Amino acid sequence: IKYFCSSPEKFKVNKKFDVILNMEIVEHVEDIQFFLKCCSKLLKKNGIMFIATINKTLKSYVFAIIGAEYVLRWLPIGTHEWEKFVKPEDLKNILKSNNLFLNKLDGMHFNLIKDEWNISKDTSVNYIAEFLKN
């Protein structure tokens, strides 16, 4: 297994990959459509792209920005911009235009008492999506 940590816009290689992981990234990029287009070009046919990100809801604003940045101080203030959060449906549409189709969508929930993340059906704050390239 080879891992590459690079921006897809700057990644210059004549290879395509079986799997691309975009974990907690897309809510920070300047141009999500261009970023995902570049990622899709790096993915082989029948490849899988995983995207973990934050939904664009009032609840996500309260939990991911007010809670995580201001109250719990898990992250520096200003780490997230709510305007860059992305709804699953919007992500699905962007990737559909790049020949990737949603295969699975799950919510992710942090349990403060157990100090652990769990998969859930609630996608209103954090979620992870699996897309397949056609």
Residue positions per predicted region:
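Residue-level marker for beta-strand->alpha-helix junctions and adjacent short loops that shape enzyme
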Residues: 56, 110-112
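Short, flexible, mixed-charge acidic loops at enzyme active sites
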Residues: 60-70
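Conserved SAM-binding loop
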Residues: 1-61, 88-91, 129-133
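General small-molecule cofactor/ligand-binding pocket signal
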Residues: 2-4, 103-106
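Short, solvent-exposed polar/charged micro-motifs at secondary-structure junctions
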Residues: 13-15, 113-117
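Core SAM-dependent methyltransferase catalytic element
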Residues: 115-134
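Acceptor-substrate binding/catalytic loop of class I
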Residues: 53, 70-90
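Short alpha-helix
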Residues: 82-105
